[in-house]
C-alpha cells in the first residue's frame, strides 16, 4: 500500500508535483511531510528546532540579531567535485571536465530495483521531509525559473528561505501545470526508533547528481551548502546552463554590478572569476575615485537573455549571499560586513566568548580566546585556523547597504561589459580589452587560476577554469564555448557587451602584489566605462587592447611608474610560452571545441610573431 503521506490538504493543485512528492515520500519513508510556506513564523520555528537539536546556536541578540551559528561535521565542509556527476544520456554530452554516470545506473543506485535497495530507500526514516518550492530570480520575471527541493534537512529548508524566493507565493506562481525543476536531497542518516540524532547528520557516501535531460537533481549524504542548497550551483548553473543552451540564453558564474560615473548614465557590468578571486568584493566595491559609485545586483550567478532591443539583460537568480567568511573584513569588504548585521547563519566560523562570530581577516586584532569551528578552545598560539577556510555566511541580499534598487527588476539590467579574470601572478596584465566578441570568448575560455579552499584539492596548483564554469557547467565544456560563440552570431555586434580580462593578482620578482586591489579596482572599471563611451585611449598589443599609462586614472595612488609599466606590459617571450599551452587545453574537448577558438589561437600566434 502506497503511503499517501502528502495527501490533501496540500497547498497546491499541481497534480504532477503532488504525485512526485508522494513518490519520494514512499521511497524515503519520512515520519512526516511539511510543505514550506516561506513565512517568517515558519523560519523562526525551523531555527528553534535546529537550536533544540544542537545544529544551531543562537548568537547574542544585541550583537547579531536573529542570527545563528552552525558547525558542520568535519568531513562535510565543501563542495565534493569528485562526487558530482552529470548523468546525461550520452557520455560525450557531459564532456571531459565532468564526471559522468549512465542515468539508469545512477537512478538504480538511488532508488534500487523493483522496490528494493537504493540509497534513498528509507533514507528519511525518523525525520521530517520538507517540500521547499522556490523561485530562481524575481517572482513573475520572464527570466526566472521555478524549482521544488525535497529535503530531510531543516538547515536546508531554513537556508533556502534566505537564498531563494521560497514558499506559497512560488506554488501560486506555478499554478496547476507550470514547469519546475525537481530536486531531491537527503543527508543519508535515517534514525531508528529511539536512536539519538547528531547535530550535523551526513553520510560518508556522497553523490551530487544531475540529470540534465530530465531537469532533475538528486543529492545524497551531504548537508553542506553547495551540495545541499540545490537551487544554487546545482540548479542555477549546472541544470540552468543546459536549459540556456537549449533555449538560447546564458547561465553564468558571474557577479553583476551597477557602476555610476559622476556624470552620465550608469553601466551594468558582469564578471566571472574562479572561487576566491574576489567576486563578492568586486560586487560590493567602494571605489576610491571621487564621484564613482558601485551598487550590487548579484555576487555569484547571472542569468542573461537578449532583449527585444538586441541588448543582453541579466538577473541575479538568488535572493541571498552564501559567501566565504575568512578574508571578509572592514578593510576588504565593508559592505559585506554591514550586510551581516543580523538575520544571518554562520557555518564553520569561530565563536567569541561574548556570543558573536569571528574568522580570519574579520578584524585587525585577533581575539585572545575563541571557540574554533571544531568546538575546541582556541588562542592565537594554537597554530590552526579558528574558522574553516571555507566557512560561510548565509544572509539576505536585501540587507546589503549598496544593493541596487533595480536588483529585483523583472526585466533584468542591460549588460555593457563582461569581465573575466583569475588569480595569476605572472604574464597577465592588469586589464585587457578583447578585439571583438569571439576574441572575448577566447579570453574567457583561457581563464586560469590557483586552486582554492572552496573545493577539496591542493591549494596553489594552477588550474584552467574556462569562464570560471569548470565545476559548474552542466554539459560538454567545448559545446558550452560553442554556445557562447553561437548566441552572438545573429546579433547586432554594436549592442553586444564588450569583453575584458582583468588580473588584480600580478606579482613582482619579490613575490609582492604590485596592484593594491580592493577599492582601487574601481580605477580599472573607470577605464572600461570610458572605453565603452569612446573617451579613453588604448594601445593594441598582440593579446588585446591595454590602457595607455595616461588613460588609467592613478591620481592619488602610491604606484611607482615602473610598477604601472609592469602592470600594463606584454612580454612577447612569456606570451609565446603562454600561447604554447593553449592547444593542449583546447584539444581537451576534441571536436567539440568550436573552430572559432582555433582561429583565435592562430591569430594570437601570428600577432606574437
From Swiss-Prot:
GO molecular function: GTP binding; manganese ion binding; phosphoenolpyruvate carboxykinase (GTP) activity
Residues holding GTP: 276-281, 392, 423, 518-521
Matches recorded under Gene3D superfamilies: 3.90.228.20, Phosphoenolpyruvate Carboxykinase, domain 1, Phosphoenolpyruvate Carboxykinase, domain 2
Top-rank lineage group of the source organism: Bacteria
Chief localisation class: cytoplasm
Active site: 277
Cellular component terms (Gene Ontology): cytosol
Keywords (A to Z) from UniProt: Cytoplasm, Decarboxylase, Gluconeogenesis, GTP-binding, Lyase, Manganese, Metal-binding, Nucleotide-binding
Top enzyme category: lyase
Biological process, per Gene Ontology: cellular response to glucose stimulus; gluconeogenesis; glycerol biosynthetic process from pyruvate; oxaloacetate metabolic process; propionate catabolic process; response to lipid; response to starvation
Sequence positions that bind Mn(2+): 233, 253, 300
HAMAP family on file: PEPCK_GTP
Protein's recorded name: Phosphoenolpyruvate carboxykinase [GTP]
Gene that produces this protein: pckG
Amino acid at each position: 500500500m502506497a503511503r499517501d503521506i502528502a495527501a490533501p490538504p496540500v497547498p497546491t493543485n499541481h497534480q504532477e508535483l503532488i504525485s512526485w512528492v508522494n513518490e519520494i515520500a514512499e521511497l524515503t519513508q519520512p515520519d512526516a511531510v511539511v510543505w514550506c510556506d516561506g513565512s517568517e513564523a515558519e523560519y523562526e520555528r525551523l531555527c528553534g528546532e535546529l537550536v533544540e537539536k544542537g545544529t544551531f546556536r543562537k548568537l547574542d541578540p544585541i550583537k547579531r540579531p536573529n542570527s545563528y551559528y552552525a558547525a558542520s561535521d568535519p568531513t562535510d565542509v565543501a563542495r565534493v567535485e569528485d562526487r558530482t556527476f552529470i548523468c546525461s544520456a550520452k557520455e560525450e554530452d557531459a564532456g571531459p571536465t565532468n564526471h559522468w554516470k549512465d542515468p539508469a545506473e545512477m537512478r538504480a543506485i538511488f532508488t534500487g530495483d523493483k522496490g528494493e535497495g537504493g540509497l534513498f530507500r528509507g533514507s528519511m526514516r525518523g525525520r521530517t521531509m520538507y517540500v521547499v518550492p522556490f523561485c530562481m530570480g524575481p517572482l513573475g520575471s520572464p527570466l526566472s525559473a521555478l524549482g521544488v527541493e525535497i529535503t530531510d534537512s531543516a538547515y536546508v529548508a531554513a537556508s533556502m528561505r534566505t537564498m531563494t524566493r521560497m514558499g506559497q507565493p512560488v506554488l501560486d506562481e506555478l499554478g496547476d501545470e507550470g514547469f519546475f525543476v525537481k530536486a531531491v536531497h537527503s543527508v543519508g542518516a535515517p534514525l531508528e526508533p529511539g536512536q539519538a540524532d547528531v547535530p550535523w547528520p551526513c553520510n560518508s557516501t556522497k553523490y551530487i547528481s544531475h540529470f540534465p535531460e530530465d531537469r532533475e537533481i538528486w543529492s545524497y549524504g551531504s548537508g553542506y551548502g553547495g551540495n545541499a542548497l540545490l537551487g544554487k550551483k546545482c540548479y542555477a548553473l549546472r541544470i540552468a546552463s543546459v536549459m540556456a543552451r537549449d533555449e538560447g540564453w546564458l547561465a553564468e558564474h558571474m557577479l553583476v554590478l551597477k557602476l555610476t560615473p559622476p556624470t552620465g548614465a550608469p553601466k551594468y557590468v558582469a564578471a566571472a572569476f574562479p572561487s576566491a578571486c574576489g567576486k563578492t568584493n568586486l560586487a560590493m566595491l567602494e571605489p576610491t575615485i571621487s564621484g564613482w559609485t558601485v551598487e550590487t545586483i548579484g555576487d555569484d550567478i547571472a542569468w542573461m537573455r537578449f532583449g527585444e532591443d538586441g541588448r543582453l539583460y541579466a538577473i541575479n537568480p538568488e535572493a541571498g549571499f552564501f559567501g566565504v567568511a575568512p578574508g571578509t573584513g572592514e578593510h576588504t569588504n565593508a559592505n559585506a560586513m554591514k550586510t551581516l548585521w543580523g538575520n544571518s547563519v554562520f557555518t564553520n566560523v569561530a565563536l567569541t566568548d561574548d556570543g558573536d562570530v569571528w574568522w580570519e581577516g574579520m578584524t585587525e586584532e585577533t581575539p585572545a580566546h575563541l571557540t574554533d569551528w571544531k568546538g575546541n578552545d582556541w588562542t592565537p598560539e594554537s597554530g590552526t585556523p579558528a574558522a574553516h577556510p571555507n566557512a560561510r555566511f548565509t544572509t539576505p541580499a536585501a540587507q546589503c547597504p549598496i544593493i541596487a534598487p533595480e536588483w529585483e527588476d523583472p526585466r533584468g539590467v542591460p549588460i555593457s561589459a563582461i569581465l573575466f579574470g583569475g588569480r595569476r601572478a605572472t604574464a597577465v596584465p592588469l586589464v585587457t580589452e578583447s578585439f571583438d566578441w569571439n576574441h572575448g570568448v577566447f579570453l574567457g575560455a583561457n581563464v586560469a587560476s590557483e586552486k582554492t579552499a572552496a573545493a577539496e584539492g591542493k591549494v596553489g596548483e594552477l588550474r584552467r577554469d574556462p569562464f570560471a564554469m569548470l565545476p559548474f557547467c552542466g554539459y560538454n565544456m567545448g559545446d558550452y564555448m560553442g554556445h557562447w560563440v553561437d548566441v552572438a552570431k545573429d546579433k547586432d555586434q554594436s549592442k553586444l557587451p564588450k569583453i575584458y580580462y582583468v588580473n588584480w593578482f600580478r606579482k613582482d620578482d619579490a613575490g609582492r602584489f604590485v596592484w593594491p586591489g580592493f577599492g582601487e579596482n574601481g580605477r580599472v572599471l573607470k577605464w572600461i566605462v570610458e572605453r565603452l563611451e569612446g573617451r579613453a585611449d588604448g594601445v593594441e598589443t598582440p593579446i588585446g587592447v591595454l590602457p595607455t599609462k595616461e588613460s588609467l586614472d592613478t591620481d592619488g595612488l602610491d604606484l611607482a611608474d615602473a610598477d604601472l609599466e609592469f602592470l600594463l606590459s606584454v612580454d612577447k617571450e612569456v606570451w609565446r610560452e603562454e600561447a604554447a599551452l593553449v592547444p593542449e587545453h583546447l584539444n581537451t574537448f576534441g571536436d567539440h571545441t568550436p573552430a572559432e577558438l582555433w582561429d583565435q589561437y592562430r591569430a594570437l600566434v601570428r600577432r606574437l610573431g
